[in-house]
A protein has these predicted regions:
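First exposed extracellular module after export/assembly in secreted or surface-exposed proteins
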Residues: 1-133
């Protein structure tokens, strides 16, 4: 398959578009990098893995329908996938956004909405999504 890397830059508040093919499984990995100090770039993903019981990645889609499941290589906490590695499958063609959250200390890991998860946003970013046939 093909691979795509999409960067989101806080200083520019924009991102490249994530391109998906409809009705196809896409293996998605996410990393959180703090590059606010170019002399001390920090991979926050390592902290999320070490503190998996205190974190959850959540994907909220607008104007597109995408099913997200935990990948077999995802970081797990008691069987629950943190969603650092996930599988996405879009059910229809279209364009929209995915809002990516890194949630600190969620209160309900089984919730299906951002509000239902509780906790605080460590990260909340919007990335354009394009789904083609």
């Amino acid at each position: 398959g093909t691979s795509q890397t999409v960067d989101w830059d806080l200083s520019e508040m924009n991102s490249q578009t994530i391109n998906l093919k409809v009705n196809t499984d896409h293996n998605v990995g996410i990393r959180f990098i703090n590059s606010s100090d170019p002399n001390d770039i920090e991979d926050i993903t390592l902290e999320v893995i070490a503190e998996a019981d205190e974190h959850q990645v959540f994907y909220e889609f607008a104007d597109v329908s995408v099913n997200v499941t935990s990948a077999s290589n995802d970081t797990k906490d008691g069987g629950r996938g943190v969603l650092l590695n996930s599988v996405w499958n879009a059910s229809s063609i279209g364009t929209g956004l995915v809002r990516v959250y890194l949630i600190h200390e969620p209160t309900n890991f089984n919730a299906t909405t951002r509000d239902g998860l509780g906790g605080n946003n460590d990260v909340a970013i919007d990335i354009p999504v394009s789904i083609v046939g």
